[in-house]
Amino acid sequence: MPSLSDEQKRRVRALARSTSDAKIGKKLGLEPGAVKAFREQEAAAQRQRRERVFKILLPAVPLLLLLLCEALLRLTDYGGSLALFVPAETAPGYLKINENVGRRYFPALAVAPEVSNDLVRTAKPPGTYRIFVLGESTTAGYPYLYNGSMSKMLQQRLRDYFPDREIEIANLAMPAINSFALRDLGPELLAQQPDALIIYCGHNEFYGALGVASTESLGRWRSLINLYLELQQFKIMRFLRAQIAAVQKWFGPAHSPAGNANATLMEQMVGDQAIPYQSEKYRRAREFFTANLKDLINAAQRQGVTVLLANLVSNERDLPPFADIFNPVTPRATFLAALERSRQLATQGNLQAALALCDSLQQVDAAPACLHFQRARILEGMGRFAEAAAAYQTSRDLDGLRFRAATDFNHGLAEVAQATGAVLVDVHAAFTRASPHGLIGNHLLLEHVHPNLHGYFLMAAELCRALQQQGMIAVDWDQTRARPDSVYWQERGVTALDEEVAAIRMAVLLNNWPFVPRERSWPLRYQPKDYLQSLAYAMWRREQTWEKVHVLLAEDYEKKGRLELAVKEYEALILQTPHNPSPYIRAGLLYANLQDFDRAQDRMLRALALTPSLEAYQVVGAILLNRGQPAQSLPYLQKALQLAPGDGRTLYNLATAHLMLGQTEPARTCVAQLEKLMPGSAEVAQLRRSLASPQPAR
């Protein structure tokens, strides 16, 4: 059958919509079979094209649906922003740490760990030195937080060393996170152009968010966990995560700690409570830890960011191990009875026999942490402190409930520093030197891992020393600018109110598992005895903010005439919220009342660097005038008058300044205004008499 020409094909296609094959063939002089064959061929080709398109589009349909869902979720702002930094509403031109950023890491518990309120400029100014501090609850300063953190204490020292340079320190630490979170935050924090990172992290590698033994664990593969975190930028991923968590909660164990609203976060995060030293799970946690840190540090150094990596401290002497792990063949009851006998011998003063009994038990089973803790106690009693320290550390390392990082993790930090070129800061050595007999315990720590204020103060001093030794910020540091440690301690900005809140947090922590058995745990029974305690309790219950309770307490002190205590509250606010002019002004007024005019002037000038203020202009002008500096006082008094044109005290000081400078006409104008405002005033009359006999200009 002859094939159709292109023209015939075109005409067949045109007629095919309304004409039969026979009529088309007759009209075009073609055999009916030729038309039918052509149309069947066309139909087959069209079917093939449709199949190809379908095969191409079919895999794209789920992707298109996901994109549509993502668009809808973004349109409705599902879950809000989980970005690390967001604009600070109260400080235009600054970024704050997003209070919701921690929600990335707790899909099942749906909690948002508390973050600091540190600010950084949106656009980093030239010459600014920017430091980000990364880590867990210790790095955040728990249980004091705020000015009780090592970052705030470090900032005090750096401000003295570099008074003419802006140094930004933002503490990005969050409770209950670990190295996975630090690695995940890396790209966002590096985008803000830090000059240095300070990292103190490692105690949460087992039970922190996504840790290998936590209730939030996502499995054995580090690459998959990090991929999961990277996908959190998509809202569809967060939506699916929330649905899965809801199903798990619905069908999960009814009485698990993770589902207990009364359990502490520490308790809710624990999955596996018995992890042997150097077990597969233990080694995996350590490998994840070092690999995550290497990823973060390498990324930072590619950007020219210096990294300080601090090693870890924990309570070695004064915290018995939480969980013992025995060899399966060990007769546990017999073993523990013998260990109790060793304790009795030690109590009776027979230390040598007690130690010998421990040594014999070690031949039976060296795995239980309690054995090494008892040996350490005996060795300490014998004055063999170096051996005692080693035994305490062994006890800590063998503790099956891994809330304290083992010595092996500090070795890992040293390996990371060696491999990446990060600066290793030996905080553990500093704590050892500062502890009686070199045994780290309650002298510097509150419980298992969180330092007391002296501990945080020591960490800040050690970090400052490391910055100086490395020539960071500047090659040469002017040592004459540093003040004694005693001054930094007095000005640390942690008041009795902060210590009371910390005491409440500690009471809750230490009266719950694992510090006491679950059956003996109890909810907080706190009865405030005075106004300070009522404010502390309100803050702990999140009924009042940190800033508000300090202001309320300061106002109460002022009403009672306790100005020295009131000014300490405002100084705490200045340290924590340096971009807020209000506490500078309130402190300046109190210092003026206390006759401390140097501090009054300093605080008011710092307030004026932030915003115009009538009170600040008035106080600075008055101080300069009283010091016999009328020319320097004039600009401040004139600005005060612009803000309050009819203010009598400002007019009086202005008139006095003009008279002291021999400027009679401006003085006369001020006196005339004063006479209208304050008719019959003896002070104004004295000014009028002074106009009649002006003083020589000063």
Question: What would you call each of these model-derived segments?
Answer:
Residues 347, 381, 559, 593, ...:
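Register position in tetratricopeptide repeats
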Residues 334-335, 368-370, 547, 581-582, ...:
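Helix-start (N-cap) detector for alpha-helical repeat units in TPR-like alpha-solenoids
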Residues 79-162, 434:
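Membrane/wall-proximal cationic-aromatic binding patches
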Residues 374, 552, 586, 619-620, ...:
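Canonical tetratricopeptide repeat
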Residues 148, 203-415, 419, 427-442, ...:
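Serine-dependent acyl-ester chemistry module
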